[in-house]
Amino acid sequence: MKLIRSTLFAIFLVIFTPIWSVLCMLAFLFLSPENRYTFIGLWNKIVIALLKPLCGIHYEIRGMENMRAVLNERVIILSKHQSAYETIAYIALLPKQLCFVFKRELLWIPFFGWALALLKMIHINRSNKQTAAHSVATQGRKRLSEGKWIMLFPEGTRTPIGSTKPYRKGGARLASATDALVIPIAHNAGRCWPKNSFIKEPGTVIFSIGPAISSTNKSAEELQREVEGWIEAEMRVIDPSAYQ
């Protein structure tokens, strides 16, 4: 049954994504950058909604009040990264327009990448660390000044459940330099949509949003350790069996 459900979902994505991407590229000719984000975000909302009846994947959000308390502040979100699910869900579920930092190779994906290129995101060349750091710093400052929230995955890539990769300091460095608040997010999306897995597992993805962390008078190293400590401790709360 899971194979059938996952296959139906894949067929939906293969058919719907190119159609929506073409619609986006046409609509973007007449929309402001802010309205482009809203328009393309409808795809995310549809996908997240469809995953419930089709694959049995639901979600639960804990700590949303921590975001609503700082809606008018400069914020950098640092999130655990396990799955494609959270990258789709954040645009659909979070209350503020996000600016993702992502590898430029995503722009080369037919249809999806082409539409993505028309949004004000930060795409980096991960093979050149110096250039990537400069892009995050310069574009990040600009996007924060426009009122957007910056979204980064400090581990840099998706990690299997129960594992941790070294946290990179790019997001913490940007927060420290701009005096932005940092909101950490832990989740267990890898349980339902594992990395590199075609099969989608039914279950509930828990998103745990932490209290905003001040970057004032903190070095990037101090801030990074505080964020990592909160996320990894919270991971053991929402998914304890993964760490036994």
PLM regions and their residue ranges:
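Membrane-interfacial terminal anchoring regions of lipid-handling membrane enzymes
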Residues: M1-L29, T38, L42, R68, ...
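Non-catalytic C-terminal accessory region of glycerolipid acyltransferases
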Residues: L3, H134-Q244
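A short beta-turn/loop motif at secondary-structure boundaries
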Residues: E65-V70, I199-K200
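Generic preference for hydrophobic
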Residues: I61, I77, F100-V101, F207-I209
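Active-site phosphate/pyrophosphate- and oxyanion-stabilizing loops and adjacent acidic/basic residues
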Residues: A49, I88, A172-R173
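Catalytic core of membrane glycerolipid acyltransferases/transacylases, capturing the structured
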Residues: S21-K45, P53-L54, A69-K129
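Transmembrane alpha-helices and immediately adjacent membrane-cytoplasm interface residues
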Residues: A49-Y59
